[in-house]
Every structure is written in C-alpha cells, then in structure tokens.
Amino acid sequence: MKITTKILSLLLVLLTTALLGCGGSQQSAEKKAEKPFRIVTSFYPMYVATINITDGVDGVEVTNMTKPQTGCLHDYQLMTEDMKTLEHADAFVINGAGMEDFMDKVTGAQKEMKIIDASRGIELIHDDEGDNPHVWLSVTDAIAQVRNIADQLKEADPAHADAYEKNAAAYIEKLTALKTEMHAALDQVPHKDIVTFHEAFPYFAKEFHLNIIAVVEREPGTEPTPSELQETIEQVNALPTKVLFTEPQYSPAAAETIARETGAKIYTLDPVVTGEATPAAKNAYIDTMKKNMEVLKEALQ
C-alpha cells in the first residue's frame, strides 16, 4: 500500500511538472508572438518617410541609426553602437543609390535582416562621382520612395500590411499636394540658374526646372581649393541675379568668401538630412520643402 501511495505521489508530481511545462511553453510562445517588429532607418530622410508609413501601427518600433546631426552619409563609418542597433532589427530601411556605402559590412553581419531599398527602380542622376544618391529631394522621387518602403514593409511584415498601405496612401496624398504647390510657386520664377553648396540638389533642380551652374564644395565637408573658389566666383559674377545657397549642415565660410568677392546674397536651402528622431518629425519633410520653396521664390525673382 505504501508503495502504491509513493507511485501515485510520483505520478502526480510528474503530471504537475508536465502541465507547468506546457504552461511555460505557451507563455513563451505568447511572448514571442508579442515581440515587436523592429525597423531601423539609415538616416533622417528615411526615418521621416518610415514613421509616416508606420504611424499608429501597434507592435512596430522605428529607430533611426545615426545621430540627429549626422546629415548625409557621405563616407560614414559604422560605429559599434550602430551594429548593436542593427543586431535587433527585423528590417533596415536605406536610401540606396550608393548613399550607404557600408552595406557590405551590414549584410555580412546581419544575414536574416530584411534590407528595404527606398530607391529601387528610380532613375538615378549620374555625375563625375557616379550615381547621385540625393533622390528624396525630388518630391516625385520622394513619393516613389514612400511607395517602395511601404511595399517592401508589407512583404517583410504581412501582419501589418493593410495599415502600412493605408498610411502610405495618406502620406502620398500629402506629398502630391506639396508637389502641386511647389510647381505652382517655382515653375514661373524668372531666373533658373543657381549655385548650390554641394551636390545635394540635382534631383530637386530637375523636378523644378532649375539649372545648377556651380557648386561651392565639390567634396562635401572639404573646403574648395583656391582655383575652385575662383572658378565659382567667376560663375556667380556671370549670373543676372547674384545669389548662392548654403546648407545648414555645413560651414558657410567658403560661400561667405564668394559673397564678399561678388556681392552675391546668401540664402539657405535645407536638404532635410538632420533632425531629432521623434514622432514630431512626421511633418519635417513637407515643412522643410515648403521653406525651401519660399527661399527660392524670394531669391530667384
């Protein structure tokens, strides 16, 4: 009888353990199911587009990889903290077109992560350095980038596909209205020749029928040589309206030298590459492009 009691007690313990194990497995599965879909963006323009597409979608987290003041990713070197951020990402949204020239390192380390190329299928502008990557500064191409990001997110995260599609459509509607407003303002400006700070604005210029006749810095962040400076001075002097455009992310020293030599007036065009990665950034692209529109309207009269 004692043996039978011991056997029954042992069976009861084993059964309880098994049931607890099943409960633990179920809880583990539920926790796994609740794991957020983590999206990392390479830099600010991609962050702004992506938070519009994911706005209000439960279970989705968006993080911008680079710091608020990084700007364009020309010659950007990945840091240890960047790789740690990407380590937990399900998808990495990049501009593409050669902007992120560190991608070999990323794909080598994160083989399971979905790479979302915002510039897929967009016709690129070529210059002496190769493909120009500043695609987002054409509103038409920015719309194409939003569509690309949304379509690829829908593939990577089908559980939220309907929400991504709805948000993308709403944002594209706003961008289309922006495009109409900017064309109405800029298509008729009397002067079309401009001098920009670096090679950020060819897509913008193509969209709004402007001619970039010179750039102040041939290499971003590198002061022009004396001969390059003199060449730009001569080009500005040949303009009927002497204006040149700086960017808030770079030192205006070279532009100020040109202005002193030519009497040109300096204006600022913002390529929308810096800002805080917060939900408030949702309107950053549209707001900044409207400011650029007003600057050009004044400068090119």
What are these regions (language model features)?
Residues 21-301:
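Extracytoplasmic metal-acquisition and chelation regions
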Residues 3-26:
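Sec-dependent N-terminal signal peptides of Gram-positive bacterial secreted proteins and lipoproteins
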